[in-house]
C-alpha cells in the first residue's frame, strides 16, 4: 500500500487532535465501588496525556529500602543500556539508540512516532561506551571510552580483548587495563542480522573459558508480518568462536 505524504500528514493531525482532550473526572472520582464514568464516545484516536520525561532534580534520589544507601555515580548519559564492571573496578556504560532503519509507510507508524515524541525524550543516543572510575574521595571520573558505534548493546571482556555487539556486527578491540580510552581501531569478528531491525538490541555473553560468545538476536517482527525469509538467524542465540 502506497500512501501520499498529504494523506499521512492529515491522518496524523486528526489522530493527534484526540491527544489534547483532558480528563474532566478526578482520579478520586474514578475509584471505589461506585466510580464516576464518562459518557461513551467514539474517537479516531483515544484521548491521552503523554507524560513529559524529566530528569532528577538537584539532590533528588530514588528511595531505597532501610539499610541500603544510594549515591549518584554519573549523569548526562545518553540512553544507557548495559553495564560491565572491569577487573580493576572501572565500570563501562553502553549508551545506544535505535538504528531507525525502517521506513515510515503507514499512518500508524507516523502517528506512533509523533505521540512518542511528545515525551521530549526521544533524542539520539550517544552510540558510545563511557568509562566510570571510582576515586579515593568517593567521587567518580567519567571518560568517553569508545565512540562511533552502531547502536551498541552487549559488551564483554575476555583477557585483553573487548567485544562490543553493535546492531549489525560484533567488534573486537585491544584493551589495556587502566586505560580510559580505546585507541585501537578494532576489527569485525562476526556480522549479525540487522535488517529491518524491529528488535535491534544484541545481548552478549562470554563462555566461562572465553572461547565462545553467545549473542541474542531478536526477531524481525511480532507476528512474522515481514515474512519468514527475514527471520533467518533471528529470534535466536548465536554462538560465535572468539579464536
Model-identified regions with their sequence ranges:
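Beta-propeller domains with acidic blade repeats across secreted/periplasmic ectodomains
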Residues: 21-243
Amino acid at each position: 500500500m502506497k500512501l501520499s505524504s498529504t494523506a499521512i500528514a492529515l491522518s496524523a493531525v486528526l489522530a493527534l487532535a484526540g491527544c489534547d482532550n483532558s480528563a474532566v473526572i478526578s482520579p478520586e472520582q474514578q475509584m471505589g465501588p461506585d466510580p464516576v464514568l464518562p459518557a461513551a464516545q467514539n474517537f479516531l484516536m483515544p484521548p491521552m496525556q503523554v507524560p513529559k520525561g524529566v530528569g532528577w532534580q538537584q539532590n533528588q534520589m530514588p528511595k531505597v529500602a532501610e539499610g541500603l544507601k544510594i549515591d549518584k555515580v554519573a549523569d548526562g548519559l545518553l540512553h544507557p543500556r548495559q553495564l560491565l564492571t572491569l577487573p580493576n573496578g572501572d565500570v563501562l556504560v553502553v549508551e545506544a539508540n535505535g538504528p531507525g532503519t525502517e521506513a515510515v509507510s503507514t499512518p500508524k507508524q507516523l502517528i506512533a512516532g509523533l505521540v512518542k515524541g511528545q515525551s521530549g525524550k526521544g533524542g539520539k543516543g550517544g552510540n558510545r561506551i563511557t568509562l566510570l572510575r571510582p576515586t579515593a574521595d568517593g567521587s567518580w571520573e567519567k571518560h568517553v571510552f569508545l565512540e562511533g558505534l552502531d547502536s551498541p548493546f552487549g559488551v564483554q571482556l575476555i583477557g585483553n580483548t573487548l567485544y562490543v555487539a553493535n546492531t549489525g556486527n560484533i567488534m573486537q578491540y585491544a584493551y589495556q587495563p587502566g586505560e580510559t580510552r580505546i585507541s585501537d581501531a578494532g576489527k569485525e569478528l562476526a556480522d549479525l542480522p540487522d535488517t529491518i531491525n524491529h528488535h535491534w538490541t544484541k545481548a552478549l555473553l562470554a563462555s566461562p573459558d572465553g572461547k565462545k560468545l553467545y549473542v541474542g538476536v531478536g526477531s524481525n517482527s511480532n507476528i512474522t508480518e515481514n515474512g519468514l525469509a527475514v527471520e533467518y538467524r533471528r529470534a535466536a542465540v548465536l554462538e560465535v568462536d572468539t579464536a
